[in-house]
């Protein structure tokens, strides 16, 4: 039975709760030798087995599909166009032997969702199913998917290998790797750095979509055009389906909208654009009112272009702009009318107007609780009647009537607000205004007590600035104003939280108390200004207004203290700065009942802790104190020995030099080496016989930033060298001595442990790379087969070629432009690996974050030559706001003397690549 071609064996399968004796087909490929060098496992499966690994589990649709009597009915449950739809329809077609339908589904599947793991599974299954009809295609599929090259040379005694002695550079060109990578149908074989080098305008729809899905930075030429091309493809999932859509600069977003005006209706586009309108990352709009106003106006200007479907967003933008104007004493009637025209479920709106608006297509009620803070930084609207009423009261003081608002607002609401505005302002004929109100409304208005702070009061004061408060007062004959100065140190040290208006003032003596008598009628509401010239110094003050049984408090906080933190050998190092960023040389710091004073340089040192974590501390400068917090760290030391030995100097009997350049770190920060005690160098050498020999030497003083050198004689029959630098340091937090060690190990002459008589060596001669096949005595080994595997920097896949050594034992590899690493396999099966890109392009240790002041020139060291590449080809520099890139700043950089110099950047955050 088993000898017939295409024979399928039989076996029994165990189900969830029972068993079946029905035969199940499985298939075996015969006469196929697959080497053990696969890079990916073929992911084919039998439908009868899917999901049965977990017995009794809820496995969803797979159960319906597997057990359905009519699978066509089961397939109707799937949503067309989804991955599951294509997967199960393809699986069903394969089980029916309908290969043409499978290929049709695969084509649509890849176009819509790319070449996913499920796609590859179906492709693998189909390739195996097609083996009987087209074995060559199946074998080609296996070779491609498993990365099989079959490039090993057969060694035949007495015959020389028939391979070239030099590598053909065309085989490892960018074009050659690209052609091989494109065989997958997408760009999965291309590295991130290689994406920018592709001819983007020549990519098909699938590859273009894959490109956009992988791009992380908007530094691709004609990127908006590429995005529009992808969006217009019938399989596009729309704007926002790729991360790069959100990383476009504002200029690119504008260009995108010009190319495709309909994007203004896309929620994803709107959200992405609004983030680009945010102020600089270094601008705090709580204090910078000018920037806050500009930001609000930018949002309002953009949202004004949106369709009625986005009325909630438009209302949010207008409301927050109105609130800001109100705080500045500005009342924009046109903007207020724009807000009133947006329908929303509130009591004051004219129901007829709202009904008409909601009947229009695409219009719905404004959601007053909609939260857009993630994209605009603005809070939700919430109840808006207080702001609306304040605007009406302001306008109605001067307006002759309220007719212009009647189409939008209930007449009853307008009458009451209009009459109140006139009566409390004492404007016009009082009897006329009384007639607009009911008796109960007039009585309530007369008895109402107002002791309210005006919206236009300043929120922030400088330490030396005089304080004044505007208060709207009504129905108060006698007003008492009291001022309390809070002892900030006592309060903060006891409570460890900021002062608020709920503070208990009982027992505190007011620094000022003054009474005011007024004779206005109970209906009159008057805005009065109160000056407090005594509040011209730093401190926290509570100003309390008491009148006719009501009390209102204002909290005045003037001045601030903050710290700059560093890590030293003795602990956390703090410098205290005031609100003008001036150093406070006499400042102290209070923490957990202990007070730490500044030294003569203004530095406060806080020892490390045995209980690390975030701590709140009180900063004190004179009579003023402020709260701050920091992460109290433990005292953790680490030693990096920085050991280096030139391996080519490790020749038996020769003098070799050991270079040690240690770095001591405390909590990850470099500190002085002077705190090291008893540093010693330990040299452990191990011979071929495995017998170790140890030598321990005192090092003496180690200077910061300098290396020390130790010369030694290389022992005979050496197999391994191990160098260890050890020292001790006093751990103040733990109260003991801590041992520190670091070591470097060098394995040598490993060939002596084997029966091998030759090795393959890599060298670079006159800018070209060569492989030398040499014996143990350095003699050339000609006609040795060498399999070379090469990895290109821009592509994920490798390419293998079979070469041989020439009469001098050399294999010519050429310049190996853009090759990242080489792996060579000699005729004896030994494998060698070299990372050549590091040595070619160099390495520069760069900080991940650079801080600079405005006007400073930032220098970034370059790892290698740029080969006349332009700025855009060499680096990208973007301004970042709220985690997205908003502006291209590549023009700010200049190449000079091995550095990239960046200057003339505005305040903000930037990302350099």
Question: Residue ranges of each PLM-predicted region?
Answer:
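Cationic, low-complexity basic patches in intrinsically disordered or flexible, solvent-exposed regions
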Residues: 5, 11, 15
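Bacterial N-terminal signal peptides that target proteins for export
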Residues: 33-43
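N-terminal, cleavable Sec-dependent signal peptides of secreted/periplasmic/extracellular proteins
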Residues: 39, 55-71, 76, 81-88, ...
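Bacterial N-terminal signal peptides
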Residues: 43-51
């Amino acid at each position: 039975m088993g000898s017939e071609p295409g024979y399928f064996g039989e076996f029994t399968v165990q189900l969830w709760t029972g068993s079946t004796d029905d035969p199940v087909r499985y298939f075996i490929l015969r006469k196929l030798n697959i080497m053990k060098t696969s890079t990916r496992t073929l992911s084919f499966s039998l439908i009868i087995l899917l999901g049965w690994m977990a017995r009794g589990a809820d496995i969803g649709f797979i159960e319906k599909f597997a057990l359905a009597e009519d699978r066509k009915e089961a397939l109707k449950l799937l949503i067309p166009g989804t991955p599951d739809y294509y997967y199960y329809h393809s699986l069903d077609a394969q089980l029916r032997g309908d290969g043409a339908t499978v290929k049709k589904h695969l084509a649509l599947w890849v176009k819509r969702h790319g070449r996913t793991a499920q796609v590859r599974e179906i492709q693998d299954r189909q390739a195996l199913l097609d083996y009987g009809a087209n074995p060559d295609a199946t074998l080609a599929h296996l070779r491609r998917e498993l990365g099989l090259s079959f490039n090993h040379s057969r060694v035949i005694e007495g015959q020389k290998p028939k391979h070239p002695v030099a590598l053909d550079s065309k085989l490892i060109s960018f074009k050659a790797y690209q052609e091989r990578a494109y065989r997958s149908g997408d760009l999965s074989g291309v590295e991130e750095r290689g994406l920018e080098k592709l001819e983007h305008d020549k990519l098909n729809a699938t590859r273009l979509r894959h490109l956009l899905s992988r791009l992380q930075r908007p530094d691709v030429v004609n990127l908006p055009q590429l995005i529009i091309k992808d969006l217009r493809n019938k399989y596009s999932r729309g704007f926002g389906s790729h991360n790069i859509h959100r990383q476009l600069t504002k200029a690119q977003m504008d260009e995108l909208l010009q190319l495709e005006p309909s994007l203004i209706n896309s929620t994803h586009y709107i959200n992405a654009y609004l983030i680009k309108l945010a102020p600089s990352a270094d601008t705090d709009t709580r204090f910078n009112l000018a920037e806050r106003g500009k930001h609000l106006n930018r949002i309002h200007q953009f949202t004004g272009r949106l369709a009625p479907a986005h009325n909630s967003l438009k209302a949010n933008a207008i409301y927050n702009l109105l609130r800001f104007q109100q705080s500045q004493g500005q009342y924009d009637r046109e903007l207020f009318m724009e807000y009133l025209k947006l329908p929303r479920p509130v009591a004051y709106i004219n129901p007829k107007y709202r009904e008409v608006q909601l009947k229009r297509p695409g219009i719905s009620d404004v959601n007053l609780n909609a939260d857009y803070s993630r994209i605009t930084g603005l809070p939700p609207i919430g109840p808006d009647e207080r702001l609306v009423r304040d605007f009406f009261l302001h306008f109605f003081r001067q307006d002759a009537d309220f007719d212009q608002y009647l189409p939008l607002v209930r007449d009853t609401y307008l009458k009451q607000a209009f009459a109140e505005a006139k009566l409390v302002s004492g404007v016009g004929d009082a009897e006329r205004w009384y007639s607009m109100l009911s008796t109960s409304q007039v009585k309530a208005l007369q008895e109402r007590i107002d002791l309210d702070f005006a919206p236009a009061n300043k929120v922030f004061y400088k330490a030396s600035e005089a304080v004044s408060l505007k208060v709207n007062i009504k129905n108060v004959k006698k007003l008492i104003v009291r001022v309390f100065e809070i002892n900030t140190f006592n309060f903060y040290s006891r409570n460890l939280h900021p002062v608020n208006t709920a503070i208990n003032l009982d027992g505190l003596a007011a620094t000022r108390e003054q009474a005011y008598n007024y004779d206005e009628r109970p209906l009159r509401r008057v805005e009065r200004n109160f000056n407090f010239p005594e509040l011209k110094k730093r401190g926290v003050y509570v100003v309390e207004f008491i009148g006719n049984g009501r009390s209102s408090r204002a909290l005045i906080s003037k001045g601030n203290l903050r710290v700059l933190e560093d890590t030293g050998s003795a602990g956390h190092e703090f410098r205290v700065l005031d609100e003008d960023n001036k150093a406070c040389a006499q400042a102290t710091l209070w923490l957990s009942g202990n007070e730490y004073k500044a030294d003569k340089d203004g530095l406060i040192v806080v020892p490390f802790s045995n209980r690390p974590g975030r701590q709140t501390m009180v900063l004190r400068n004179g009579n003023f104190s402020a709260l701050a917090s920091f992460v109290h760290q433990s005292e953790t030391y680490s030693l990096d020995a920085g050991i280096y030995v030139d391996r080519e100097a490790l020749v038996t009997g020769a003098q070799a030099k050991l270079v040690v350049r240690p770095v001591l770190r405390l909590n990850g920060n470099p500190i002085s080496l002077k705190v090291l005690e008893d540093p010693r160098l330990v040299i452990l050498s191990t011979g071929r016989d495995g017998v170790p020999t140890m030598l321990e030497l005192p090092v003496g003083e180690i200077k910061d930033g300098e290396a020390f050198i130790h010369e030694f004689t290389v022992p005979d029959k050496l197999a391994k060298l191990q160098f260890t630098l050890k020292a001790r340091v006093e751990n103040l937090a733990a109260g003991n001595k801590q041992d520190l060690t670091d070591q470097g190990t060098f394995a040598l002459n490993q060939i002596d442990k084997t029966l091998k008589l030759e090795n393959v060596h890599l060298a670079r001669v006159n800018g070209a790379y060569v492989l030398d096949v040499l014996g143990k005595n350095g003699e050339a080994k000609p006609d040795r087969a060498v399999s070379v595997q090469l990895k290109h920097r821009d592509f994920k896949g490798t390419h293998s070629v079979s070469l041989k050594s020439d009469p001098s034992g050399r294999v010519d590899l050429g310049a190996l432009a853009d090759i990242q690493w080489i792996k060579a396999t000699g005729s004896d099966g030994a494998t060698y690996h070299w990372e050549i890109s590091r040595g070619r392009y160099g390495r520069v240790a760069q900080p991940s974050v650079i801080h600079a002041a405005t006007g400073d020139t930032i220098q970034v060291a370059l790892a290698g030559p740029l080969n006349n590449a332009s700025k855009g080809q060499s680096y990208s520099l973007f301004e970042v706001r709220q985690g997205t890139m908003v502006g291209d700043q590549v023009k700010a950089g200049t190449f000079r003397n091995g550095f990239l110099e960046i200057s003339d950047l505005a305040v903000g955050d930037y990302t350099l690549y």
